């Protein structure tokens, strides 16, 4: 269906809140499947029968870690060999059920799982409902239907559990696009992607918190160092702030990705150390600005992998080819954490110090107002000139040489 448009995440959340079933699909390079999803609090016989009739797949009950611990739901196997490490627990039936398989009895089991008074001894093992334990951090950690189900229930203000069921076509194969789209239209059912849900959470969830603020005298001048910690990963970042940000408008700013080799060792394989020095100098001269120092070593692949990439470059690859050879994208960085740090600092609009167009787009996608790009001007050397040319040619970096 060429004219099909996915639903808004807000509409999907509202449908979940109202007890309706929605359709969610994952990435093409993952399972590439659509699942029915609803909240466990609305695991009615009607909803379960609909999933069994039209979905035909296994009806599961994604739950949070807290619920799994409370009810003593243990992993189904000691060593998980599932292709996507889906966290099945031992299957269960509620003790008030008979065989446990009918839509009515599966409804009882699912709803009792989210009963505030439920306890481990209320369930027989094995059974006909299949709890799945969602990863802490949800779809931002694992892009699966398990995590999408629990995230959607949480965002709807409901208990952190739900139902999901894969959708098969009439011939027994898994239903894919455009048949999933056609089904959603025919049944007036909200249809979203896990990628949409990830993007929604990056914009709306509070994913970083400020820990401390201290004076930081540097060789460039005196700054205030604001420390931040990511809520999900525990990764630590720093914002170096100069001057008064009260109005938050047109702040001279830079997002600088950590580069131990360039920033601390003075490596000439890259221009990172020079860019950091240039940005600090410009902000000091302006008397007002922010540098976010993010823990994104090696364009997000980490220090050891960056050094492995250097090893491949010494054998003839360029910086992009080396990253790809190691199984990474040319640039693994995300900018939603940086955008949230700017927001917590009261920054409303920025003049961004960067030569990287992807950084501009990444911040704009998070709703940050970039009123101007300020180039970072550094002189190439004999050791990094080829690296800089590759970034210019293959990654679109805006250099003037």
UniProtKB/Swiss-Prot annotation:
<comment type="function">
    <text>Catalyzes the conversion of GTP to 2,5-diamino-6-ribosylamino-4(3H)-pyrimidinone 5'-phosphate (DARP), formate and pyrophosphate.</text>
</comment>
<comment type="function">
    <text>Catalyzes the conversion of D-ribulose 5-phosphate to formate and 3,4-dihydroxy-2-butanone 4-phosphate.</text>
</comment>
<keyword id="KW-0378">Hydrolase</keyword>
<feature type="binding site">
    <location>
        <position position="275"/>
    </location>
    <ligand>
        <name>GTP</name>
    </ligand>
</feature>
<feature type="binding site">
    <location>
        <position position="272"/>
    </location>
    <ligand>
        <name>Zn(2+)</name>
    </ligand>
</feature>
<keyword id="KW-0511">Multifunctional enzyme</keyword>
<keyword id="KW-0686">Riboflavin biosynthesis</keyword>
<comment type="pathway">
    <text>Cofactor biosynthesis; riboflavin biosynthesis; 2-hydroxy-3-oxobutyl phosphate from D-ribulose 5-phosphate: step 1/1.</text>
</comment>
<dbReference type="InterPro" id="IPR016299">
    <property type="entry name" value="Riboflavin_synth_RibBA"/>
</dbReference>
<dbReference type="InterPro" id="IPR000926">
    <property type="entry name" value="RibA"/>
</dbReference>
<dbReference type="InterPro" id="IPR017945">
    <property type="entry name" value="DHBP_synth_RibB-like_a/b_dom"/>
</dbReference>
<feature type="binding site">
    <location>
        <position position="359"/>
    </location>
    <ligand>
        <name>GTP</name>
    </ligand>
</feature>
<dbReference type="GO" id="GO:0005829">
    <property type="term" value="C:cytosol"/>
</dbReference>
<feature type="binding site">
    <location>
        <begin position="142"/>
        <end position="146"/>
    </location>
    <ligand>
        <name>D-ribulose 5-phosphate</name>
    </ligand>
</feature>
<feature type="site" description="Essential for DHBP synthase activity">
    <location>
        <position position="128"/>
    </location>
</feature>
<feature type="active site" description="Proton acceptor; for GTP cyclohydrolase activity">
    <location>
        <position position="331"/>
    </location>
</feature>
<feature type="binding site">
    <location>
        <position position="145"/>
    </location>
    <ligand>
        <name>Mg(2+) 2</name>
    </ligand>
</feature>
<dbReference type="InterPro" id="IPR000422">
    <property type="entry name" value="DHBP_synthase_RibB"/>
</dbReference>
<dbReference type="InterPro" id="IPR036144">
    <property type="entry name" value="RibA-like_sf"/>
</dbReference>
<dbReference type="GO" id="GO:0008270">
    <property type="term" value="F:zinc ion binding"/>
</dbReference>
<feature type="binding site">
    <location>
        <begin position="30"/>
        <end position="31"/>
    </location>
    <ligand>
        <name>D-ribulose 5-phosphate</name>
    </ligand>
</feature>
<keyword id="KW-0479">Metal-binding</keyword>
<feature type="region of interest" description="GTP cyclohydrolase II">
    <location>
        <begin position="204"/>
        <end position="401"/>
    </location>
</feature>
<dbReference type="InterPro" id="IPR032677">
    <property type="entry name" value="GTP_cyclohydro_II"/>
</dbReference>
<keyword id="KW-0460">Magnesium</keyword>
<feature type="binding site">
    <location>
        <position position="166"/>
    </location>
    <ligand>
        <name>D-ribulose 5-phosphate</name>
    </ligand>
</feature>
<feature type="binding site">
    <location>
        <position position="319"/>
    </location>
    <ligand>
        <name>GTP</name>
    </ligand>
</feature>
<dbReference type="GO" id="GO:0009231">
    <property type="term" value="P:riboflavin biosynthetic process"/>
</dbReference>
<feature type="binding site">
    <location>
        <position position="31"/>
    </location>
    <ligand>
        <name>Mg(2+) 2</name>
    </ligand>
</feature>
<feature type="binding site">
    <location>
        <begin position="254"/>
        <end position="258"/>
    </location>
    <ligand>
        <name>GTP</name>
    </ligand>
</feature>
<feature type="binding site">
    <location>
        <position position="259"/>
    </location>
    <ligand>
        <name>Zn(2+)</name>
    </ligand>
</feature>
<feature type="binding site">
    <location>
        <position position="35"/>
    </location>
    <ligand>
        <name>D-ribulose 5-phosphate</name>
    </ligand>
</feature>
<feature type="binding site">
    <location>
        <position position="31"/>
    </location>
    <ligand>
        <name>Mg(2+) 1</name>
    </ligand>
</feature>
<dbReference type="GO" id="GO:0030145">
    <property type="term" value="F:manganese ion binding"/>
</dbReference>
<dbReference type="GO" id="GO:0005525">
    <property type="term" value="F:GTP binding"/>
</dbReference>
<dbReference type="Pfam" id="PF00925">
    <property type="entry name" value="GTP_cyclohydro2"/>
</dbReference>
<dbReference type="GO" id="GO:0008686">
    <property type="term" value="F:3,4-dihydroxy-2-butanone-4-phosphate synthase activity"/>
</dbReference>
<keyword id="KW-0342">GTP-binding</keyword>
<protein>
    <recommendedName>
        <fullName>Riboflavin biosynthesis protein RibBA</fullName>
        <ecNumber>4.1.99.12</ecNumber>
        <ecNumber>3.5.4.25</ecNumber>
    </recommendedName>
</protein>
<feature type="binding site">
    <location>
        <position position="270"/>
    </location>
    <ligand>
        <name>Zn(2+)</name>
    </ligand>
</feature>
<feature type="site" description="Essential for DHBP synthase activity">
    <location>
        <position position="166"/>
    </location>
</feature>
<feature type="active site" description="Nucleophile; for GTP cyclohydrolase activity">
    <location>
        <position position="333"/>
    </location>
</feature>
């Amino acid at each position: 269906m060429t004219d099909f448009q996915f639903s808004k995440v807000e509409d999907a959340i509202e449908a979940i809140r109202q007890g309706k079933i929605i359709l969610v699909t994952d990435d093409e390079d993952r399972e590439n499947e659509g699942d029915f999803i609803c909240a466990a609090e609305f695991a009615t016989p009607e909803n379960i029968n609909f999933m069994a009739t039209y979905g035909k797949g296994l009806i599961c009950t994604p739950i949070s870690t807290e619920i799994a611990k409370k009810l003593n739901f243990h992993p189904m196997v000691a060593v998980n060999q599932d292709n996507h490490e889906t966290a099945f627990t031992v299957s269960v039936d509620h003790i008030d059920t008979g065989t446990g398989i009918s839509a009515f009895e599966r409804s009882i089991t699912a709803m009792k799982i989210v009963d505030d008074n439920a306890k481990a001894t209320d369930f027989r093992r094995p059974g006909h409902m299949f709890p799945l334990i969602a990863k802490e951090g949800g779809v931002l950690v694992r892009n699966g239907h398990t995590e999408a189900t629990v995230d959607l229930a949480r965002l709807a203000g409901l208990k952190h559990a739900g139902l999901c069921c894969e959708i098969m076509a009439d011939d027994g194969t898994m239903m894919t696009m455009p048949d999933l789209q056609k089904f959603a239209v025919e049944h007036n059912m909200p249809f979203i992607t896990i990628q949409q849900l990830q993007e929604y959470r990056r914009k709306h969830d509070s994913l970083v918190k400020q820990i401390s603020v201290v004076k930081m005298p540097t060789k460039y001048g005196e700054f205030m160092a604001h420390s931040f910690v990511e809520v999900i990963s525990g990764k630590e970042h720093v914002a170096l702030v100069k001057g008064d940000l009260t109005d938050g408008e047109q702040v001279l700013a830079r997002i600088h990705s950590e580069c131990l080799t360039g920033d601390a060792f003075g490596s000439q394989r890259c221009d990172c150390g020079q860019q950091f020095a240039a940005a600090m100098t410009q902000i000091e001269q302006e008397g007002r600005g922010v540098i976010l120092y993010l823990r994104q070593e090696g364009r997000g692949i980490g220090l050891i992998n960056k050094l492995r990439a250097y090893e491949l470059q010494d054998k003839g690859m360029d910086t992009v080819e080396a990253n790809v050879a190691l199984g990474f994208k040319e640039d693994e960085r995300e900018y939603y954490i940086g955008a949230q740090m700017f927001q917590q600092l009261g920054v409303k609009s920025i003049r961004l110090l960067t030569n990287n167009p992807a950084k501009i787009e990444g911040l704009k996608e998070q709703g940050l107002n970039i009123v101007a790009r300020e180039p970072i001007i550094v002189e190439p050397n004999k050791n990094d000139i080829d690296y800089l040319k590759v970034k210019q040619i293959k990654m679109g970096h805006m250099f003037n040489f």
